[in-house]
Amino acid sequence: MPINKSEKPESCDNVKVVVRCRPLNEREKSMCYKQAVSVDEMRGTITVHKTDSSNEPPKTFTFDTVFGPESKQLDVYNLTARPIIDSVLEGYNGTIFAYGQTGTGKTFTMEGVRAIPELRGIIPNSFAHIFGHIAKAEGDTRFLVRVSYLEIYNEEVRDLLGKDQTQRLEVKERPDVGVYIKDLSAYVVNNADDMDRIMTLGHKNRSVGATNMNEHSSRSHAIFTITIECSEKGIDGNMHVRMGKLHLVDLAGSERQAKTGATGQRLKEATKINLSLSTLGNVISALVDGKSTHVPYRNSKLTRLLQDSLGGNSKTMMCANIGPADYNYDETISTLRYANRAKNIKNKARINEDPKDALLRQFQKEIEELKKKLEEGEEISGSDISGSEEDDDEEGEVGEDGEKRKKRRGKKKVSPDKMIEMQAKIDEERKALETKLDMEEEERNKARAELEKREKDLLKAQQEHQSLLEKLSALEKKVIVGGVDLLAKAEEQEKLLEESNMELEERRKRAEQLRRELEEKEQERLDIEEKYTSLQEEAQGKTKKLKKVWTMLMAAKSEMADLQQEHQREIEGLLENIRQLSRELRLQMLIIDNFIPRDYQEMIENYVHWNEDIGEWQLKCVAYTGNNMRKQTPVPDKKEKDPFEVDLSHVYLAYTEESLRQSLMKLERPRTSKGKARPKTGRRKRSAKPETVIDSLLQ
């Protein structure tokens, strides 16, 4: 029995936020930029210095985990992504996404260099982790793993694994499923190598471009989704299905046109990217602000798809990527502020038990039906087995007209062993037929034809049996049995992850011990400072405290000034977007006013409505108007006239001067294109023109 949502255990967790700082790249070194970011991995703090202002105090941010420029890919995975993927394998939804300015290493964190095991990112490492877990599961547990890959390019959702990557897909929502993409292709995978091949295929179709800040800049947001269904026996003895979805999101970076040098198509892409990231920031702000009653999920495709990941049914980890150069000071501060705000988002994740859109139970049911068919044998008609059986399968039935009719019984079941026996019997009868020389030629041909017919039917049954076996094998390949070694090449990667995880645990214990010792020393120092032996020492102590408070005051003032500047920049950006939209709106209104009459404009406005699902205006009942109806209506053939149609053009419907004039005008011969009358024939002569006749009649 499916469990109601209210009965499912919920875990209320905050969004986990980690920060990763990349090292200075070659371009920044050649331009002699200074390092403005300091990372303290033990304390979990990021400190940003403003190098061109010595009076301004540094800004410090604290997060769950921070990674410096020397951090390893395996450490990043084990500390951040491993807990999320373990939760997905238990049946929770999970989301991992990288956020930050363009060129800060988001794609490297998520994907890395797949050819080198030590440099693989979160997505490839998750493949080995998932199938490593399946290989260690119990033998009666069944798994089904499927993947999909999409991108959001210029606010259009595209399928990176479909035949046509430029086709625009629609975002839909259902109460039982939630937000989903209509017609998005998904592929069932059996091992980590299959996943890697599919990801490589989708990555080739992704939109990338070069800017001044990044040669391989992602021009779209990409979401790689892994759906893991698990079927195992519950306490009640019944089989229960759990389904976890893992969304691995690689966001395009926010960018400034002055720094990236984007023009033309790149500028249009940057505008759309910045708008969607701005909406993401607004969603984060609305979720954190307790007073906000509306969360603008629908303002962009990205936030609509991440609706469950931010404040919904999901365990979410956000990796904020920053650059260390003082050149990107403003962008780094902005990213850290958004990340600091996202820490306060609360999600309510629950295990998805017996979901309606699970495929594992459907596959298992089909496998059982196919096995049952194969055990019982194929269905072939009684006449296909043998001549003697054909006589037994027919029995007389007398109808109302007294004539005898034959009724065929049900179909016979033929097992594989029975097929072998039948084949041997057919061979024996063929040999016996060849040895009988005293038979008539007609009887021999008849017997041979009967044997060929039976052999053909037997061959057909064997082919159907083989087809069922192949279908069963294909379905069983899709369903993965727990405890089977599926790692292949990924086994080495899983081993590497395990070793790195053990090493991290030891380092974490040592770091925790050092942190406790450091706190104790700090407390001892404070206690010593509190004990003054003279007024002079007390004055020195008070002066130190005063300096600390003064530093904090200056930091608060600097923070306020930075916030005002950032707010001003956001306002300017929004105003620029408004000006651009206003120009486009004026152009559209000019076209409409010059080509569509005012009455029709009002009619269109009355019958138009906004469709939230596809983000477009739609006209009501447009299917029953214009060309749509003209396509369905058959065009009458002008050459063929209706035999029942009567020409009533010459009949007076009213005896008025105008009707008389019109009826006589029709008698005039048609004129040629030059305006001259056609030559008169000998049969038909008119003494006067119609105008003369009309005038005479009226007089």
Swiss-Prot record:
Basic residues: compositionally biased ranges: 672-687
Alphabetical GO biological process terms: anterograde axonal transport; centriole-centriole cohesion; cilium assembly; microtubule anchoring at centrosome; organelle organization; plus-end-directed vesicle transport along microtubule; protein localization to cell junction; protein transport
Cellular component GO terms, alphabetical: axon cytoplasm; centriole; centrosome; ciliary tip; cilium; cytoplasm; cytosol; extracellular exosome
Keyword match Coiled coil: yes
SUPFAM superfamilies membership: P-loop containing nucleoside triphosphate hydrolases (SSF52540)
Region (Disordered): 372-421, 663-699
Gene Ontology MF annotations: ATP binding; ATP hydrolysis activity; microtubule binding; microtubule motor activity; plus-end-directed microtubule motor activity; protein phosphatase binding; small GTPase binding; spectrin binding
UniProt key word Cytoplasm: yes
Chain ranges of the Kinesin motor domain: 14-345
Coiled-coil annotated residue ranges, if any: 355-590
Phosphoserine modifications at: S687
Acidic residues bias: start-end ranges: 376-400
Chain positions recorded as ATP binding sites: G100, Q101, T102, G103, T104, G105, K106, T107
Subcellular location: Cytoplasm, Cytoskeleton; Cell projection, Cilium; Cytoplasm, Cytoskeleton, Microtubule organizing center, Centrosome, Centriole
Major location (coarse): cytoplasm
Function in brief: Microtubule-based anterograde translocator for membranous organelles. Plus end-directed microtubule sliding activity in vitro. Plays a role in primary cilia formation. Plays a role in centriole cohesion and subdistal appendage organization and function. Regulates the formation of the subdistal appendage via recruitment of DCTN1 to the centriole. Also required for ciliary basal feet formation and microtubule anchoring to mother centriole.
Subunit: Heterodimer of KIF3A and KIF3B. Interacts with CIMAP3. Interacts with CLN3. Interacts with DCTN1. Interacts with FLCN. Interacts with AP3B1.
Sequence similarity: Belongs to the TRAFAC class myosin-kinesin ATPase superfamily. Kinesin family. Kinesin II subfamily.
Name recorded for this polypeptide: Kinesin-like protein KIF3A
Source species: Homo sapiens
Gene: KIF3A
